[in-house]
A protein has these predicted regions:
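N-terminal membrane-targeting hydrophobic helices
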Residues: 1-167
Length: 167
């Protein structure tokens, strides 16, 4: 499905107009520009909704019909469950477990260097380390320690300016 189809589900379920919902659904699916298979679905997790979508769009908003819309509920019922055929919503642990063929030699050192070179704020550091906190898996930091997260997601969250450096 695409963001317009998801937004139309939201309109049918919650009222309002397509424009009320399209930005949320477009962000959830924005990772398709990174890869077009199921690996793009990092924002299709509870972590993605809680740590990325809600900080950008807030917990609630009022749609054009005057209805109060809970962002978490919208994401889960109108997008994530739909994409997973109403079977489940994956956790970030599920996503990380599916990350295969990650070269681990020197990974800790590379991630630590990236973190110290790019991050200078304790709250921002906590956001970037949150996948590790949840999963206990070092490779989970590849989700947040990359140019897409630093230069697209963090500025949308209002947590950082884009960084003009080699990644």
């Amino acid at each position: 499905m695409n963001p317009v189809q998801h937004a139309n589900i939201s309109v049918k379920r919650r009222g309002g107009e397509l424009e009320d919902y399209i930005d949320i659904h477009a962000l959830i699916d924005s990772t398709k520009m990174l890869c077009t298979d199921n690996r793009h679905r990092i924002l299709h997790t509870f972590w993605g909704v809680q740590e990325v979508i809600i900080p950008i769009f807030g917990h609630h908003f009022e749609n054009s019909a005057g209805n109060s819309i809970e962002v978490k509920d919208l994401c889960e019922k109108d997008h994530l469950l739909v994409d997973f055929h109403h079977r489940f919503i994956p956790t970030i642990g599920d996503f990380v477990a599916a990350m295969q063929d990650i070269p681990t030699y020197g990974l800790a050192k590379r991630l630590e260097k990236f973190h110290s070179d790019v991050i200078d704020d304790p709250k921002l550091s906590a956001t970037l380390l949150s996948p590790l906190s949840v999963t206990g898996q070092l490779k989970s930091l590849l989700i947040t320690h990359n140019s897409w997260f630093i230069n697209t997601i963090l500025p949308m969250m209002g947590k950082s300016e884009a960084k003009f450096i080699d990644f």
